Design a protein with these regions (language model features):
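Long, compositionally biased intrinsically disordered regulatory segments in eukaryotic proteins
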Residues: 1-140
Length: 140
């Protein structure tokens, strides 16, 4: 299956284009919701490692994406991301956030599987992904 055909990617693209009036706040909300779910499972250190790797990989396309300037603080975990996105045009910021989310979830899915990744994202973003995950498995 082509990577661009993954329903998870389509979901991320859809979510990153919603609420354009909220701008970077909407982008950070997606990350905050996902982090809350994943940290319960893999811990803050595990999440931070995956996030740092995703930023590093995404910097080849968007070199202005900032890596964390220090140890993450729970209440400001995505402050550097927000600053990076705010410094760009809304379209470029949206595209970069979409790539970063896709990169992050690709890494996660390679570790825990597509089905579990979809379930976690569905829980984080309050979306029923059961049908989505079943379609992914059946078409693989």
């Amino acid at each position: 299956m082509q990577t661009s055909d993954l329903l998870r990617h389509q979901l991320i693209k859809s979510l990153t284009t919603q609420r354009p009036e909220k701008g970077t706040d909407a982008a950070v909300d997606l990350w905050t919701q996902m982090a809350a779910q994943l940290i319960l499972i893999i811990g803050a250190g595990g999440f931070d490692s995956l996030y740092a790797r995703s930023v590093f990989l995404s910097q080849s396309t968007h070199p202005w994406l900032a890596a964390r300037s220090g140890p993450p603080q729970t209440d400001h975990r995505f402050a550097d991301l927000k600053k990076s996105l705010q410094a760009q045009s809304p379209t470029l910021a949206r595209d970069a956030n979409c790539l970063l989310l896709i990169t992050f979830t690709n890494i996660l899915a390679s570790m825990i599987g597509e089905h579990l990744t979809s379930r976690i994202l569905g829980s984080a973003w309050d979306i029923d992904t059961q049908d989505t995950a079943d379609k992914e498995i059946n078409s693989a």
